[in-house]
Amino acid sequence: MILAVTVPEDYPDDLTRRVAISSSIYPDPHTHIETVTYGHAGDSMSTLYTLLVGDGTRVTRPLKLLGQIVRHPVKFAKTLWPQGWSRRTIIVLVMQTLDNAIALRPKLKRSGAVRLQTEQDPERPNPTFIPVANEAAEWLAKRTGGIAQSSLTEALINVPTTAHILGGAVIGHDSEDGVVDSCQRVFGYENLLVCDRAAIPANVGVNPSLTITALAEHAMSKIPAKDAQVNGASGSTAGRAGSRAS
């Protein structure tokens, strides 16, 4: 889930003069919050945010947003002005280790084109509101005199925004229960591997860059040298030049 806090124009510091992701906290055992900046050229990202909105449904959350606009018209007007937004904005990136999931389903459009559409897992739905996320944004806004913001999709249609869509290429024993094997090789295809976040089998709850790197290294370690022989499904080498078994 992604929220934002925009500090006042007279704030003394340029928030982009720092490492993009520099600090994080665990407000509870399942939740990890990072502060992020987009950099000087990220002003257009302001169109993805609006005033902070609380919990609700697809019906009540837009009404709550309307109420926020009526109560805070000046703050709302400021969120509509993109110039300098990125320099003055802290992104609040909220991640959890809870076992929830969404699915991507093909949907046929009237034009005949096919597009992918997300669908909630009925048994493990992805949360559309995380109380501690709003609390963190409100706390940061209070400390800086800034404006706390929800993502536009969250406020208007009760759909959260994520930076890390994980999974999709399931690790399995064979093509009946997975896409790739334990070495991340795609079943039924030669020399095709999945080395990105699609192969991550669980919700890691933190920025997954290092996990992706580790998986990629694992997959590469199973590829034999050009002059080696592949020994079974494990991808280990039977011998190398100058030391082959006779």
Which sequence ranges carry the predicted segments?
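A glycine-rich dinucleotide-binding beta-alpha-beta segment and adjacent secondary-structure elements
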Residues: I90-L93, Q117-A202
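C-terminal catalytic lobe of FAD-dependent flavoproteins
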Residues: Y49-K142
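Short conserved micro-motifs at the rims of enzyme active sites and ligand-binding pockets
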Residues: D13-R17, H30-V36, A101-L108, V180-C183, ...
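Short, glycine-/Ser/Thr-/acidic-enriched flexible segments
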Residues: V7-P12, Y26, T97-N100, E176-G178, ...
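Internal hydrophobic alpha-helix adjacent to the cofactor/substrate pocket in enzyme cavities
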Residues: A137-I147, A216-V230
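Flexible loop/turn segments at secondary-structure boundaries
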Residues: M1, Y11, N100-L104, A155-T162, ...
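Mid-to-C-terminal "cap/lid" subdomains and adjacent gly/pro-rich loops that border
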Residues: M1-W85, A225-S246
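A conserved FAD-binding loop/helix module that cradles the flavin
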Residues: A202-M220
